[in-house]
Amino acid sequence: MPRGVAIPEVRQHLFSAVERVIGRDGPGRLSGRAVTVEAGVATGLLYAHFSDLDDFLAAYAVDRAFLVSSGASALSGRAGEGSVTRNLCDAVLATPLETVRPWARLLVARPDLAGGVHAVLGAGTAGFDAIEAAVAAYLADERGLGRVAATADPAALALALVGLLHHVVLSADAGPDAPDASDRLRGAVTALVDGSTATARH
């Protein structure tokens, strides 16, 4: 990035850079310099917007948790429409896995950042917690409409679905020959949920 050139959405530009650093080198190699080199900007730009690296990472964690939470909110009001499985897959994949993966890896490496996310967005209402809550509420609504088996446990299914998402984003190989993570997740969600919806149809 040439010096003197204005960068629109500086924060998002830096957030995208930290995602690439985590994706390539892992969260253990993070530094302010690594992020700014990846972003193609002067090191001082990061510190012009954030007090230090921890402040930057906390802001990034909150921003991406909000994105994930917003994607989960798409389930609200979908009960009774379309396919139960498709609705769930669309909501879980509303935020691209390429965005979810580095964020999740960072939170595993830096669990202290979760406290900052909860302080800003609320405990139990952000990130994976938001997906779990939205899925449980949606499945309960579908159960009430008879589209999910009366014996199904919405909370347990929601927890299992979030566990699948967490496993896929943390274990996925980003290499060119790796299986598509979205396809893996869709297949797993279908296998998890279809039994309950099939039972409801009989």
Model region roles, listed by residue range:
Residues H13, A17-D55, A59:
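Helix-turn-helix
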Residues A59, A72-P102, L157-A158:
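Hydrophobic alpha-helical connector segments
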